[in-house]
């Protein structure tokens, strides 16, 4: 009997993708509630509020070539409308995300083009990166452990996408315990390979429910396979404001 048990154990740990957590115990309900609450707090500092507008300047450097785009983004919860401001050749084009569905809208086209949040926008930035972050709603917490980043105490989340409509399949995410903001993220492909890393800076502040809190000023994306490739998303002109639901009406946007 003991040899049968040993054989089964060896087979289990040999199966590709099988995760054996001999020293870990499942989170209790209180720990899970705390983990979700902290993740939600970190989402607020990356745009998941009831009404907000910002400008993004995206700069991508790859193989000695630099590309730039600028967009104005209107956000209401998980809905977002991004309007290209520059360069001139793309000005007026739009990206709409509504209920985690996404479309590309180009002046002169009679119909919007369905796109995926996972598709490349510019450099290391994906379409979904321009929208607000809703990790607390879009991902399942697979694990939640204490860690550090740059000597700052953090909680390290291992997040798994709830569906294929979200931007990434799996994320490892470091959230500051004290400041309640995301500091670093590692993004993984469907096959489980890490393909990019992001670091976040918070030089802006916004008022949410009467409370001042940090707001993202920069997202720096590094390609895990091509070390010299780098994309910077810089956030400017942050404004808390009322956003009309009609801003996300697909029929109105294609007129």
Model-derived regions, located:
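Short, surface-exposed charged micro-motifs
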Residues: 70-72, 93-94, 172-174, 199
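Gly/Pro-enriched, hydrophobic low-complexity segments
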Residues: 152-248
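Flexible, processing/modification-adjacent segments and terminal tails
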Residues: 23-40, 47-50, 57, 67, ...
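Bacterial N-terminal signal peptides
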Residues: 6-15
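Positively charged n-region of N-terminal signal peptides that target proteins for export
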Residues: 1-4
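Hydrophobic residues embedded in beta-strands of well-ordered beta-sheets
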Residues: 79-80, 102, 112, 182
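Sec/Tat signal peptide C-region and signal peptidase I cleavage site
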Residues: 15-22
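N-terminal, post-signal-peptide region of Sec/Tat-exported proteins
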Residues: 50-81, 85-87, 180
């Amino acid at each position: 009997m003991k040899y049968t048990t040993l054989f089964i154990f060896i087979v289990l740990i040999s199966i590709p993708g099988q995760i054996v957590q001999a020293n870990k115990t499942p989170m209790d309900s209180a720990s899970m509630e705390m983990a979700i609450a902290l993740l939600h707090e970190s989402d607020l500092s990356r745009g998941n509020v009831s009404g907000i507008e910002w400008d993004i300047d995206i700069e991508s450097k790859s193989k000695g070539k630099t590309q730039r785009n600028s967009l104005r983004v209107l956000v209401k919860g998980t809905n977002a409308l991004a309007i290209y401001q520059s360069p001139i050749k793309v000005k007026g084009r739009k990206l709409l995300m509504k209920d985690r569905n996404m479309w590309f809208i180009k002046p002169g086209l009679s119909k919007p083009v369905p796109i995926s949040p996972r598709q490349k926008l510019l450099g290391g930035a994906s379409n979904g990166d321009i929208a607000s972050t809703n990790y607390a709603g879009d991902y399942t917490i697979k694990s939640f452990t204490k860690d550090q980043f740059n000597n700052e105490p953090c909680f390290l989340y291992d997040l798994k996408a709830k569906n294929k409509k979200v931007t990434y399949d799996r994320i490892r995410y470091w959230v500051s315990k004290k400041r309640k903001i995301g500091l670093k993220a590692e993004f993984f492909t469907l096959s489980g390979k890490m393909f990019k890393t992001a670091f976040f800076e918070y030089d802006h502040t916004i008022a949410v429910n009467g409370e001042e809190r940090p707001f993202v000023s920069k997202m720096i994306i590094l390609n895990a396979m091509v070390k010299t490739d780098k994309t910077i998303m810089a956030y400017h002109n942050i404004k808390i404001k009322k956003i009309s639901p009609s801003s996300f009406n697909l029929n109105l946007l294609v007129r």
